[in-house]
């Protein structure tokens, strides 16, 4: 018996339902993942900034300073410059210890400003002030100041505006520091650590650019997860009247491989939670579950993204390449010397130490 052809009305209904289901599913997907769209489509609507001119960085142990200066196209000074290190501090106590121990022989004055308010206008403890005993080794070189910005709980400042207010406050500390024309001032965050050999070049070589960005090896969660060389905001500035503290692009020249930038490199899970709600991108905490300690611990050991975000890239090639977790590295070579000398104390910053304490 011949099979009856499908009913024309049923076929038309099917043709209508299939696209409707597909469109509805797409809209539902976009609704739940709309925060990904700007990042997914960024290569279409945004252009990368002007590339830096990268200065090659020459260094090897026991190579003389005259030769190192010469290799960079600079000349040896008769005496070393003074170096000032200026940072706005939040809660990175362990990295600050690594920073100050590593840079102590080269820095004339450490300038540290601490606020009782986060970028998101939350009241915060003065973590440094509560832990000054950890930094007694640097107290003779330290100029510390507290800053209490005016905050209205009913109308808090936007996070990036508050960040700008706090960074501008560092300028008063610079003016009190005794800095003079021709000195070098490092402007960076606490987790952006120039290498000692970089500071040695800045101390002893004449001819360096007046504003030199520092290309830092970027790590996430610890030195077990190297990301790339994308960190550029730290700068070395030849001081002149009118030089102001900034954490943004100031020139087109960058010194290659000039140190380390370890983002979210904390000992305790609670420190991760604090930063997630305290820094300028706190709006990325879209759900309370993002702050769950077990979730954070899992992401740290996977090399994933705490905010479930797509990478901020300008090409689809880089976007796709960075959509996977950060590959682990077993190398602890070319890291800060103090870190290696105190590996037991800072095990959480080294390969194999991803498990954190919960308290």
Give, region by region, the residue ranges found by the protein language model.
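Juxtamembrane luminal stem/stalk of type II transmembrane Golgi/ER carbohydrate-processing enzymes
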Residues: 1-86, 91-92, 106, 305-308, ...
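Active-site-proximal specificity loops/subdomain of glycosyltransferases
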Residues: 50-83, 116-188, 195-200, 323-339, ...
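Short, well-formed alpha-helical segments that are part of the catalytic scaffolds
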Residues: 92-105, 109, 119-130
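Eukaryotic short linear interaction motifs
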Residues: 93-95, 118-121, 152-153, 193-195, ...
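Short loop/turn motifs at secondary-structure junctions
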Residues: 106, 180-181, 208
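Conserved beta-strand scaffold positions in the cores of enzyme catalytic domains, especially
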Residues: 110, 142-146, 211-213
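Short internal beta-strands
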Residues: 111-115
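Conserved catalytic core of nucleotide-sugar-dependent glycosyltransferases
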Residues: 192-308
């Amino acid at each position: 018996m011949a099979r009856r052809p499908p009913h024309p009305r049923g076929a038309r209904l099917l043709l209508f339902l299939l696209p409707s289901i597909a469109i509805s599913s797409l809209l539902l997907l976009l609704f739940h993942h709309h925060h990904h769209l700007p990042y997914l489509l960024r290569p279409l609507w945004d252009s990368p900034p002007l590339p830096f001119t990268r200065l090659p960085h020459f260094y090897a142990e026991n190579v003389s300073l005259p030769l190192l200066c010469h290799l960079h196209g600079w000349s040896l000074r008769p005496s070393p410059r003074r170096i000032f290190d200026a940072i706005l501090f939040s809660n990175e106590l362990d990295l600050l210890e690594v920073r100050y121990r590593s840079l102590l022989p080269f820095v004339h004055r450490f300038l540290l400003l601490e606020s009782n308010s986060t970028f998101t206008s939350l009241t915060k403890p003065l973590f440094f002030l509560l832990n000054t005993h950890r930094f007694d080794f640097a107290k003779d070189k330290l100029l510390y100041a507290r800053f209490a910005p005016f905050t209205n709980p009913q109308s808090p400042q936007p996070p990036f505006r508050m960040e700008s207010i706090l960074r501008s406050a560092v300028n008063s500390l610079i003016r009190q520091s005794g800095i003079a024309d021709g000195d070098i001032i490092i402007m960076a965050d606490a987790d952006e650590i120039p290498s000692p050999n970089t500071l040695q070049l800045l101390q002893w070589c004449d001819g360096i650019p007046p504003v030199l960005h520092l290309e830092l090896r970027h790590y996430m969660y610890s030195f077990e997860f190297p990301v790339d060389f994308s960190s550029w905001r730290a700068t070395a500035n030849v001081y002149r009247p009118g030089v102001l503290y900034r954490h943004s692009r100031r020139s087109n020249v960058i010194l290659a491989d000039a140190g380390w930038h370890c983002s979210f490199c904390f000992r305790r899970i609670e420190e991760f939670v604090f930063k997630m709600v305290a820094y300028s991108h706190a709006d990325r905490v879209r759900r309370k579950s993002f702050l769950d300690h077990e979730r954070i611990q899992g992401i740290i050991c996977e090399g994933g993204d705490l905010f479930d975000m797509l990478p901020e890239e300008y090409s689809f090639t880089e976007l796709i390449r960075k959509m996977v977790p950060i590959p682990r590295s077993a190398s602890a070579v070319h890291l800060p010397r103090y870190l290696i000398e105190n590996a037991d104390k800072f095990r959480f910053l080294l390969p194999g130490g991803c498990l954190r304490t919960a308290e």
